[in-house]
Amino acid sequence: MRKHFGTDGIRGRANVVITPELALKVGQAAGVIFQRGDHRHRVVIGKDTRLSGYMIETALVAGFTSVGMDVLLLGPMPTPAVAMLTRSMRADIGVMISASHNPYEDNGIKLFGPDGFKLNDDLELEIESLIDGDMRNRLSASRDLGRAKRIESVHARYIEFAKRTLPRHVTLDGLRVVVDCANGAAYRVAPETLWELGAEVISIGVEPDGFNINHDVGSTAPETLVQKVRELRADVGIALDGDADRVLIVDEKGQKVDGDQLMAAVARSWQEDERLTQPGLVATIMSNLGLERYINSIGLTLARTAVGDRYVLEHMRQHGYNLGGEQSGHIIMSDYATTGDGLVAALQLLSVVKRRNLPVSEVCHCFEPLPQILKNVRFRSGEPLRADSVVTAIAHAKDRLGQSGRLVIRPSGTEPVIRVMAEGDDRDLVAEVVDEVVDAVTRAAA
């Protein structure tokens, strides 16, 4: 049974769940496990722009150095940049301090192995066992303590990496781009990358103050971006979240393009260029049935996984896919990155737009999404999904939807809520079955 790790690292309210004491123990435990070989061991640590990042960063430094690991501090950097730099800087482990799209009050700790991939379940459980144990006999002698220093040049390294994911002959000349960095980790690197590639760049969400990350900006609050794109007659809008591992696109008409539509557009282009390593892509159970029907219609297949980009990536690695992602905008292009990278995904889409010489609206809306309704039911304790009344309601709902729709019920991996999602050709029917299941779950959770 997991105590600390969820579907995307450790996450919770800063100084309540994510305390200095916990961060210290995470640093010590991870440091012990990843000290392999006789070389001088090092860890890279990045963070987003939350006020609590300073506190957690300092505690992690104390933890890693106390077990003899050197620490390289990157400062505010996107999660995918930390993964890339873990490999590039030959680190034994990478750490990202972020709660992604959550408000500033929350924070989290994500860990990457030396290959830049998120840790598997076994390693996370091994770290958990050490966190809850006595670490005193694992501490280094005074002469063997680690050192810590800040690295100043990392922004340029990530910008060059992102630019190199485009063919040399492809530029963004002639594109007016509005980019929303969510007052988060990409506030510096995303606008600079787009500008260096030739775009006319208008930036919003680039004034972090420790409190305003994801506040009315970013991929989970794209209304400001939509308004700016229309107002400035931009060609495209790009919204990143707080740690820039997810992206939402806005076309020139102000219409939103989610992860499903983005994957469809890229999959079609990569299929034509024979760039797909498998004849299909990987998505989660939350991706729209319209995506699956479209992918099948062009001769490709859609593999589904549990929710979470780690499970998408796991399936991609096991079965040889190089394209996958989530409706929420976590897009993984494994030719370039070991995790979701919002900026790289946006660049790959813009490459398709430039190649086709068409407006974003004509490239991105490959299919008509089926009506999809998602509702959350908050609960305090227990397992309401095991209640007989809920089991009966779920079975009845699935019978009503039949072959023309889908029903997905799952507990969130990051907060105490149960998500109820249904989709199908008949919007009224979808709404009815969602309400029925939500009512049953709500009563069981009371």
Swiss-Prot record:
Q: Which GO terms describe its biological process?
A: carbohydrate metabolic process; peptidoglycan biosynthetic process; UDP-N-acetylglucosamine biosynthetic process
Q: Which cofactor does it need?
A: Mg(2+)
Any note on cofactor binding? Answer: Binds 1 Mg(2+) ion per subunit.
Question: Which InterPro entries did the record assign?
Answer: A-D-PHexomutase_a/b/a-I (IPR005844), A-D-PHexomutase_a/b/a-I/II/III (IPR016055), A-D-PHexomutase_a/b/a-II (IPR005845), A-D-PHexomutase_a/b/a-III (IPR005846), A-D-PHexomutase_C (IPR005843), A-D-PHexomutase_C_sf (IPR036900), A-D-PHexomutase_CS (IPR016066), Alpha-D-phosphohexomutase_SF (IPR005841)
This protein's source sits in the domain of life called Bacteria
Q: Which reaction does it catalyse?
A: alpha-D-glucosamine 1-phosphate = D-glucosamine 6-phosphate
Q: Where is the active site?
A: S100
Q: Which GO terms describe its cellular component?
A: cytosol
Tell me which residues bear Phosphoserine.
Answer: S100
Name the Gene3D superfamilies for this protein: Alpha-D-Glucose-1,6-Bisphosphate, subunit A, domain 3, Alpha-D-phosphohexomutase, C-terminal domain
Q: Which GO terms describe its molecular function?
A: magnesium ion binding; phosphoglucosamine mutase activity; phosphomannomutase activity
Query: What are the entry keywords?
Result: Isomerase, Magnesium, Metal-binding, Phosphoprotein
Record flagged with keyword Glycoprotein = no
Mind telling me how this protein is modified after translation?
Activated by phosphorylation.
**Can you tell me which residues bind Mg(2+)?**
S100, D241, D243, D245
KW Isomerase (keyword) present? yes
What Enzyme Commission number does this protein have? 5.4.2.10
Name the SUPFAM superfamilies for this protein.
Answer: Phosphoglucomutase, C-terminal domain (SSF55957), Phosphoglucomutase, first 3 domains (SSF53738)
What is the similarity comment for this entry?
A: Belongs to the phosphohexose mutase family.
Briefly state the protein's biological role: Catalyzes the conversion of glucosamine-6-phosphate to glucosamine-1-phosphate.
The record ties this protein, via HAMAP family, to: GlmM_B (MF_01554_B)
Can you say what this protein is called? Answer: Phosphoglucosamine mutase
Organism for this UniProt entry: Methylorubrum extorquens (strain PA1)
